[in-house]
Amino acid sequence: MSLYREVDAFRVDDERRRVPEKVVNDIEVRIRINGGMEQRFTASPQALEEFATGYLLGEGLVDSVDDIVSIEISDNIIDAEIESGDLDIRRELVMGSDCFGGWRQRVEMVGPVDSDLRVRADDIFLAFKRMVKSAVVWRMTGGTHVAALVTGDEFRVFEDVSRHVAVDKVIGSGAMDGVNFRESFIVYSGRMPADMLIKVVRAGVPIIASNAAPTSSGYDAAQRTGLTMLGFVRGKRFNIYSHPERII
């Protein structure tokens, strides 16, 4: 399935006229883990294996791709088999993550970021320019978020209707290719709440930069985990909200 389709719309300015417009395609995706635990997502219909891999890592359901036994995809249903271990405990953290301050329990289970990476401000600006240039579907539809993982000269980028899924996809793609996340940074479009930052920290990425704002929970999570968080990356400026020593 394409990432977008063309529909009829009426444009109203000085007059009203029928015009063709492109809209982004979205689907409901289900992830079933070990035949039991199930989560539903709205996502763009591509790179579902990368999404599943990044989701499993970012939610702490596995510690590495070696813990993933298999991923099978059929009719927008993803069946993932993983090494079970302490799955019941991990499942409780995932299912409760968005309610009653559940992110605070999750952040206590995440170790501090272990990375000596240093990044020049100009590299952040260049990565953002490249990310925006790569966001073809966003330019056509205005309906996607975009995320990029930068590792030295390597640059991988995904668009998705969900900002969380876009980040899952770049993490999953990097993990499948054996990327050293401790030597990587993520740039993306979207707010930075705690659940997003915990996902990045679990992968081992030390820096995240967005053109949008952090939330207070995101600020607290970044401070606690040692993550360097940049917001409002626009033109030739940005704000550093935590652990500024990584930006030179």
From Swiss-Prot:
Keywords: Cytoplasm, Molybdenum cofactor biosynthesis
Chief place of localization: cytoplasm
A family per Pfam: FdhD-NarQ
Residues of the active site: 99
Taxonomy, superkingdom: Archaea
Transmembrane regions: none
Binding site for Mo-bis(molybdopterin guanine dinucleotide): 232-237
Coiled-coil stretches: none
Compartment(s) of residence: Cytoplasm
GO cellular component: a single term: cytoplasm
GO molecular function, one term: sulfurtransferase activity
Any GO BP annotation: Mo-molybdopterin cofactor biosynthetic process
Family: Belongs to the FdhD family.
Full protein name: Sulfur carrier protein FdhD
Organism, as annotated: Methanothermobacter thermautotrophicus (strain ATCC 29096 / DSM 1053 / JCM 10044 / NBRC 100330 / Delta H)
Gene: fdhD
